[in-house]
Structure formats: structure tokens, C-alpha cells
Amino acid sequence: MHIFSKLDAFEQERSARLAHPKLSQYPTPFKINVGKLNAGVWPSSVPDLAVMEIRYGMSPNETVETAKAEFEAFIEQICSEDPWLSEHRPELEWLGTCWHPISVDENEELIQLVNQNMRLVRKRETEITGIA
């Protein structure tokens, strides 16, 4: 659980450092979410194994490779500071879908066309933002 307890601070630091203007409406645009946590076989036993599956949000200001390297360095730093973890290093495996971070210039023709049509349909100005 030592790693789990440090994820929030890492998430906040990344969100502040990698901020993107089109994602400013999100307090934490690059979420690190432990979606699955499996440990132990009985409520009163101390688990000998824990498996965390994490959603690791990435910024348009970084590549997948640099984001992964930063997370791996984060885990390595925790392990180097903890005697037990330094001898029992966690296995890190990248699973499933990887949504590459992207930012599209709002002056791109497609963006302008969608924006223009939204104004026609909604009869008001639109705001171009990002999704996290």
C-alpha cells in the first residue's frame, strides 16, 4: 500500500506541471485511477500479493514513452526509499488500450467547420475545450 498512498501526490504534481489550456476546466486532468485492486484471500489475513490495475492519464504535452518512463521512475523512487520494496520490487506491466494524448490546433479546418455548424444549430458562440 506504500505505492498506493503516494499516487495522489504524484497525480497532482503531474497535473500542475503538464497543464494544458484546453483542459483547465478539470481540477485533475491527468487522472491516476486505481480501477481494480485485488489482494488477499480472506478478510482477516495479511495478503502476500496485491495487484493494482491503474488508469494513467497522459497530457498532450508529453509522449506515451515519456509518460511511461516517468511512471516507471516514480515506482523506482518509491522502491529505493523503502527497504522492503527495494528487495521485493513490484512488477510493472502495461496492459490494454493506450489512448495517445493529442492536441489539435483549433484553427484546423475540421475544428472550424464543426464550430461553425454548432453556432448555426445552437444559435450562440461555442467554446472549444478538451476532454480528459
Feature roles, as predicted:
Residues 1-36, 88-132:
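An extended, acidic, His-containing surface patch that forms the Zn2+-binding/catalytic region
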Residues 1-83:
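Midchain, well-structured core segments that form catalytic/ion-binding scaffolds
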